Every structure is written in structure tokens, then in C-alpha cells.
From Swiss-Prot:
The gene is Nr4a2. It comes from Mus musculus. A motif (Nuclear localization signal (NLS1)) lies at residues 338-350. Keywords: Cytoplasm, DNA-binding, Metal-binding, Nucleus, Receptor, Transcription, Transcription regulation, Zinc, Zinc-finger. This is Nuclear receptor subfamily 4 group A member 2. GO terms for cellular component: cytoplasm; nuclear speck; nucleoplasm; nucleus.
Length: 598
């Protein structure tokens, strides 16, 4: 049985269906890309003088409809399907022709070449009448060719196959063509070409002309040819690998040193402040553990070991001393009552309360210490010009000079102590009347307390606020027996080994306390509680505080003693007023009258 063999050409690996090429050998050949009119619209240029038409050419859908019934002239084609490179045969039988003879050179095919999937049978249909009467087709040039029968068999089989393709979904034609760019082409040189409306020229071209697209050759011997669509050089793998290997700079990390400060202790990265100083997490934890555990360190060198990021763990003594030197405050370390609560304050009560005074700075004890240091004379600038340790001095001179000296020392201390009181956090926020009342009521107590803390009772040296140093015997005629009580109190106070922080709190508590006649006693009480808590925290975690559980009680017990000494001072002033040897200054007289207990 005669059969027509269809050639299956090999397509390059990875080729898409849109890139497969079809070639039809005959005078009436059509490209398979034009067989999908729902995706491609084109115009036809009628340039062949042998074909004339009075009206426009029929639409492409008309041609396709005619394929279903048959044409008098069926376009011959050679259908080339780029699949796998294997050969298969299409069997044609029961073909009845009208006045046509099979060409003698058609090679017979054997049954062994039939595909295993089965045979495909086709039958011709009756010739239809052209839909356009004025469209004339020349028949004689096609059938005069001796090999026209062979071409007709091929055309009929390919045409029927194209009709079957119309019944199945057709992938959209690709209007873009891609070319392999030569090696070394830069990535930015990629181009894309898009052709305009497709034209179908009717001029015949020489048979056997060839076109090369993307390295594949196909023959276009018929008058209808598909022009090249466009070129788009492909991106070479070498350039792509270079782009992938290029390292993109990453954005700066959140914890980079450029966005943060440095630790004041070791120089490591520090995000925020801890205990009053910008420090790293390591130095913060070291300082916290040292203060809470009251740790004692010993330097094995000369107490000047380098403390940096690399050597900060070598000497704990020098590291802790540097923490204190840069300003870290021990009193800010959390107490036992706040451990495990992340420093959260108690929840606010639902009931409204009176507005509290502005919160003092976090380092309250540091402010108290600073105020005390600023209000005391430096040890290098003391005035020893009037100091005499001769016991006969108390017998020399008259009482007027000693009484005037007594008044001068009191008035000179009053201005200095007032300046110290104004530096206490929260004191300046109180009403002015309450400030004056607290200061005047506690002036003599503060005078005695500060004098007792500065003086050296063993040597009998009394150091006053203005820097004047006098011997105890030089003050007996002016101060009377009051000076002996002051020296005794100084001796007991210094035996307690009170540090400057605890003493600053005691001095503040001597003034900020409950007094008769306060306008806002609640605010004074709140400020007093803050100072008491600050003193308690300091004593609890201070060196030696844990070994002396009654140390805080002894410190607070000095306040009633000051009240007794203040009463003795008022009695001395009252006696001098009665003696009337030297009139007291107005400020001392007012102080005496305002602070009388009766």
C-alpha cells in the first residue's frame, strides 16, 4: 500500500513549540505560523501580475473553512515536525482521484515502517466552490508538472493534519525571536526587534532559497515566505555567573560600632548608659555584681593595670576602680526589694493623689555629695593665721572680742549652709515659706554637724565653714560650755567612720524633717522618705554595712543628739543677749526669736 513518509527533523534541545519551523514545498506554500488567525493578523500584498482580483482577498478563516471541504487546488506542503529525530510513516489508503495518476517515482513503503501507535487514514472531500467569485486560481501550472501527484499526496496529508491541529488548543505565536549573542558581548547590549504587520508577498521567489534563523536552515521555495521577526541576543552564562558572583554590599547592621558609643571603662561598644555612665554590658554586669556582693578585690601589681576590651578581666580591682573613676554610682544599683522585677515601680493607685514634687535625679546621693563638697573648704586652703594652741590664750583679751568672733563664725556659716541647702534635689521645689522655716529651724543643727565632721577633736582643731582653723581653747570664751559638747559629739561621730555619702544624707535629713508651721508637710515628708531610702540603700551595700546591722540605726540616732545640741546653742545666744556685751546681728536675733520652742 503506498504511503507518504513524513520527515521529522531534530530540534535543538530546549526549543519551544513556538520556535519549531515548518516548510512546505510547492508553488502554493503557507507557513504554519499563519494557521492561527485568532492570534495573528496580517495583510497580503498582491504583486503578482498573473493573479488578478476585483475585490479584496478572502479572509484567512475562509481559507481554513475551505480546507475542511477541500480545494480544487490544495497547497502542497512538506510537514516537518522537529521532535526526536526518529522516522515514522503515515499510511494513506483509499484515495480516489479525479483523472489523476500516481506518479511513477513515488517510493513504496513497507508495513514494517508503520508506527506502533496505529495508522492514520485520510479521504478526499468533494471540491468546493470558491467563496469569492472573482478570486481565480490557475490550475494548469500545478498539474502540468509531472511530480504534481506526488506533491498533491503530501499536500493533502499535511492539510488534513493542519485541520486537526485547529481542533486542539494552539499555543500563542511568539512574536519575539532570540539569537545567541557572540562571546564577549556585554550584558547591556541585549537588543529586541519586533516586526510590524506581516505581509504576504505573492511574487514568486527562486526555488531553493534558504534563510538562516538561530542556526537552523529551512527552505522557502514557494512565493509565500515568513520574514524574520526580530533578534534578541541572549545573555551569556559567563556574564550571568559574573553578576551572581558580584557581592552586594550589605546594609550596616543594627549593632555596628558606627551607630553606637564606646564604653567609658574598657572601650567596647556601648549602646546606652548604665548607672550614670555609658558602659558596655560586660562592665555593667561586673559593676552590679561587685556592688551587690560587696566584693573585695586586690591588685597584684601597682594598682594601675590597663583596662581595655582585651585585658579588662585581668585585674578586677583596677577595673572596679576605673568604674568608679568614670562616674558609675554604686547607690543606683538595684536593691533586694526590686530584684527580679526589672526595676519596675509599684503600680499607681486608682484613687487620685496630690501632685508629688518633681522626681529627683537618679543619682540622688551623688547630688548630695556634690553639694556637700562644694560647701566645704578645701584642705589645702585652710586659714591657720589665727590658730594658737597656747592654753593661756583664753585668758588674754576681753570677752567682747570672743563674743564678736562667735557671732562672726555663725553669720559666716549661715550663707554657706543656705547655698548648700538650695543644691539638695527637691528642696528648691518646696514653697519659699517652707524652705525658710526648714533652714532656720535646722541652722544650728547643721552648724554643729558640719563642724563636728570636719574638725579633729583629738588635736583640738576646729575647722569652720569659711576655712578658719581655731583651737578648742580659742573658742571657750565665745561659745561657753557649748564648745565642749560640740567636741564630744565630733569625737563620737568620727569614731563611727561615716563616709561622705552617708554623712551627706544625714545632713540633708537634719534639715528636711517635720517642723511645726509647714504649709505642705506632705511634700516635705515625701522628700524625706527619698533621702532615707537613699541612705538605706547606701548603707546596705556599702563596704562594711552588711557586717554592722545596727549601723543605720546609729546614724539616724545622731539626729536627736543634734536637737539637744541645738537647744544648747539657743541657750548660749540667749545668755549673750542677756549679758548685752555685744549686740547680736539682726539675722542671729531673728533666728533666735523664730526658733524658740516656747
Amino acid at each position: 500500500m503506498p504511503c507518504v513518509q513524513a520527515q521529522y527533523g531534530s530540534s535543538p534541545q530546549g526549543a519551544s513549540p513556538a520556535s519549531q519551523s515548518y516548510s512546505y514545498h510547492s508553488s502554493g506554500e503557507y507557513s504554519s505560523d499563519f494557521l492561527t488567525p485568532e492570534f495573528v493578523k496580517f495583510s497580503m500584498d498582491l504583486t503578482n501580475t498573473e493573479i488578478t482580483a476585483t475585490t479584496s482577498l478572502p479572509s484567512f478563516s475562509t481559507f481554513m473553512d475551505n480546507y475542511s471541504t477541500g480545494y480544487d487546488v490544495k497547497p502542497p506542503c512538506l510537514y516537518q515536525m522537529p521532535l526526536s529525530g526518529q522516522q515514522s510513516s503515515i499510511k494513506v489508503e483509499d484515495i480516489q482521484m479525479h483523472n489523476y495518476q500516481q506518479h511513477s517515482h513515488l517510493p513504496p513503503q513497507s508495513e514494517e515502517m508503520m508506527p506502533h501507535s496505529g495508522s492514520v487514514y485520510y479521504k478526499p472531500s468533494s471540491p468546493p466552490t470558491p467563496s469569492t467569485p472573482s478570486f481565480q486560481v490557475q490550475h494548469s501550472p500545478m498539474w502540468d508538472d509531472p511530480g504534481s501527484l506526488h506533491n498533491f499526496h503530501q499536500n493533502y496529508v499535511a492539510t488534513t493534519h493542519m485541520i486537526e491541529q485547529r481542533k486542539t488548543p494552539v499555543s500563542r505565536l511568539s512574536l519575539f525571536s532570540f539569537k545567541q549573542s557572540p562571546p564577549g558581548t556585554p550584558v547591556s547590549s541585549c537588543q529586541m526587534r519586533f516586526d510590524g504587520p506581516l505581509h504576504v508577498p505573492m511574487n514568486p521567489e527562486p526555488a531553493g532559497s534558504h534563510h538562516v534563523v538561530d542556526g537552523q536552515t529551512f527552505a522557502v521555495p514557494n512565493p509565500i515566505r515568513k520574514p524574520a521577526s526580530m533578534g534578541f541576543p541572549g545573555l551569556q552564562i559567563g556574564h550571568a555567573s559574573q553578576l551572581l558572583d558580584t557581592q552586594v554590599p550589605s546594609p550596616p547592621s543594627r549593632g555596628s560600632p558606627s551607630n553606637e558609643g564606646l564604653c567609658a571603662v574598657c572601650g567596647d561598644n556601648a549602646a546606652c548608659q548604665h548607672y550614670g555612665v555609658r558602659t558596655c554590658e560586660g562592665c555593667k554586669g561586673f559593676f552590679k555584681r561587685t556592688v551587690q556582693k560587696n566584693a573585695k578585690y586586690v591588685c597584684l601589681a601597682n594598682k594601675n593595670c590597663p583596662v581595655d576590651k582585651r585585658r579588662r578581666n585581668r585585674c578586677q580591682y583596677c577595673r572596679f576602680q576605673k568604674c568608679l573613676a568614670v562616674g558609675m554610682v554604686k547607690e543606683v544599683v538595684r536593691t533586694d526589694s526590686l530584684k527580679g522585677r526589672r526595676g519596675r515601680l509599684p503600680s499607681k493607685p486608682k484613687s487620685p493623689q496630690d501632685p508629688s514634687p518633681p522626681s529627683p535625679p537618679v543619682s540622688l546621693i551623688s547630688a548630695l555629695v556634690r553639694a556637700h563638697v562644694d560647701s566645704n573648704p578645701a584642705m589645702t586652703s585652710l586659714d591657720y593665721s589665727r590658730f594658737q594652741a597656747n592654753p593661756d590664750y583664753q585668758m588674754s583679751g576681753d570677752d567682747t572680742q570672743h563674743i564678736q568672733q562667735f557671732y562672726d563664725l555663725l553669720t559666716g556659716s549661715m550663707e554657706i549652709i543656705r547655698g548648700w541647702a538650695e543644691k539638695i534635689p527637691g528642696f528648691a521645689d518646696l514653697p519659699k515659706a517652707d524652705q525658710d522655716l526648714l533652714f532656720e529651724s535646722a541652722f544650728l543643727e547643721l552648724f554643729v554637724l558640719r563642724l563636728a565632721y570636719r574638725s579633729n577633736p583629738v588635736e583640738g582643731k576646729l575647722i569652720f565653714c569659711n576655712g578658719v582653723v581655731l583651737h578648742r581653747l580659742q573658742c571657750v570664751r565665745g561659745f561657753g560650755e557649748w564648745i565642749d559638747s560640740i567636741v564630744e559629739f565630733s569625737s563620737n561621730l568620727q569614731n563611727m567612720n561615716i563616709d561622705i555619702s552617708a554623712f551627706s544624707c544625714i545632713a540633708a535629713l537634719a534639715m528636711v524633717t517635720e517642723r511645726h508651721g509647714l504649709k505642705e508637710p506632705k511634700r516635705v515628708e515625701e522628700l524625706q522618705n527619698k533621702i532615707v531610702n537613699c541612705l538605706k540603700d547606701h548603707v546596705t551595700f556599702n563596704n562594711g554595712g552588711l557586717n554592722r546591722p545596727n549601723y543605720l540605726s546609729k546614724l539616724l540616732g545622731k539626729l536627736p543628739e543634734l536637737r539637744t545640741l541645738c537647744t544648747q546653742g539657743l541657750q548660749r545666744i540667749f545668755y549673750l543677749k542677756l549679758e548685752d556685751l555685744v549686740p547680736p546681728p539682726a539675722i542671729i536675733d531673728k533666728l533666735f526669736l523664730d526658733t524658740l520652742p516656747f
